[in-house]
Amino acid sequence: MEAARILVVGAGLAGLALARSLRQAGFAPELIERADRWDIAGTGMYLPANGVRALRALGLQDAVAARASDIPRQRVLDHRGRVLVDADMHQFWGGIGPCLALPRSELHQLLREGVPVRMGRTVRSLERPDGPVGVTFDDGSGAEFDLVVGADGLRSTVRRLAVDRRPPIPVGQQSWRFLAARPAEVTTWTVLLGRGTSFLSIPVGPGLVYCYADVTTGRAGGAAPNGDPVGQLRRRFAGFAAPVPGLLEQLDDPAKVHVAPIEQVAEERWGRGAVLLAGDAAHGMSPNMAQGGSLAFEDALVLAACLRDAGTISDAVAAFVARRSPRTAWVRAQTHRRDRTRNLPPFLRDLVLRSFGQRIFRSHYRPLLDPV
């Protein structure tokens, strides 16, 4: 199996992790990326300890930790700053590892070190998905591969060509993301909840804080709003307690705010024959469990192990899907449960979180304590 011809499409977090894991297992995958240069969004990444555990297996935990903030607690407040939930991350995750947060660009840089990537190339068509897969690239050239893995994100070309033509669907939330200078009071993961709104701030290394804000729009509200995102944020989150006013006051350039609807894949699908999906291409979902990167890193480790241990590509693919599907389906279900809780009337939501927030947190994350 080490001689298997493997194409990985997409050099985001999922594709880079997969290429790295495959190389560790003795394979020589070809990794291609549509973009002709790196242009990583100026946002942040929060990695719960199961994701950090996966990075440890990829040989990157120490390098990531050196650039990241350790996140000791998750605090949920109402919009006036009153505590609803205060969960101890070190106590919950125990020896599995720390929870870390850092700029997305720095995590991407660490993942791509030592991993060859062919830039400015993508897939135009896929033939014989049962294998060997005939691939035509966007420059008209072609090649055959024993396995093609689409790790090309929520709007995956590989998914559209071979697995599921349906586009992602909105979950009913609009998001704004940006980085800001870190005020002294931002020491850990902290979210403030309003009526149909939330504002999250996370330290992401020395001097920086990652801010994520969203508003519930309803299922039809998939399009990004027009206009000035800075003004939108200031209007939507007027009246929120610290640190929100100070963070919004820092914003002086609308181009630094990344605005997008929150979307998920129409249905969790893993592939067709020797065309496989990984990361968001397979199971993209709402970010409210902060598991997008972590699940992608776990996918990378499990797929490499299945290919190493199986006798055939089809056996490896079947083993991979059997191991990953229950875990990713669980996380997807929890994102829906969390959305239902946050969309309760504020007085009822706050009562539920004050009374049962710790129990809810543990129930949502407990299965992720188990190794992959």
Regions found by a protein language model. Name each.
Residues F27, L60, A242:
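Short phosphate-binding/catalytic loops that engage adenosine nucleotides
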Residues S156, S175-R177, T197-L200, A282-H283:
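Histidine-centered metal-chelating micro-motifs
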Residues W189-G221, F237-F240:
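Active-site substrate-recognition segment that forms the wall
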